[in-house]
Regions:
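Phosphate- and other anionic-substrate recognition elements at nucleic-acid/protein interfaces
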Residues: 2-3, 9-154
Length: 154
């Protein structure tokens, strides 16, 4: 089974594809650069089409999206990207997905929201016995965590 965890930024989409086999897993981390020369509608179309191709190529069954924490400083374009990604998931063959902020991701993973989830996301505590967890970028740590949170969906 293939699961994807996604985290967007205004300039790129980070994603981790996790393959679950029996009692083990493997993963790849990738990023999709958003062309700066495109205007906003073209950027959204590019992300939707390219990510849908990735979903189809890897036969993604479950997906998780790390969404922007609610705040007055939220980046409007990142929120648009998160919306277009949710729409493309609805158009894909994925059976189930979820969107999560830090607390809801922690809840799905059984990690308390008492500062522990932040410690794990920041790489200060291990996660799922993933080697070199601290060496991964925070964006990829979030992608992997949201992918494993999606794994727990029914």
């Amino acid at each position: 089974m293939n699961i994807i965890g996604i985290r967007s930024s205004p300039t790129k989409i980070f994603f981790s594809i996790v393959t679950i086999e029996e009692e083990s897993f493997s993963f790849i981390n990738q990023e999709l650069l958003i062309p700066v020369s495109f205007d906003t509608p073209q950027k959204l179309k590019y992300v939707r089409k390219t990510m849908l191709d990735i979903f189809n190529e890897y036969n993604i069954i479950k997906a998780g999206i790390r969404v922007t924490e609610p705040s007055a400083d939220a980046n409007d374009f990142r929120i648009m990207l998160e919306g277009i990604i949710q729409e493309l998931i609805a158009s894909s063959k994925a059976e189930i997905y979820f969107t999560g902020v830090k607390a809801s991701i922690g809840s799905k993973l059984g990690i308390p929201n008492d500062g522990t989830i932040s410690e794990v996301m920041d790489g200060n505590q291990p996660f799922n016995e993933i080697p070199d967890w601290k060496e991964l970028s925070k964006e990829y740590r979030e992608c992997l965590m949201v992918a494993f949170a999606a794994l727990n969906l029914n």
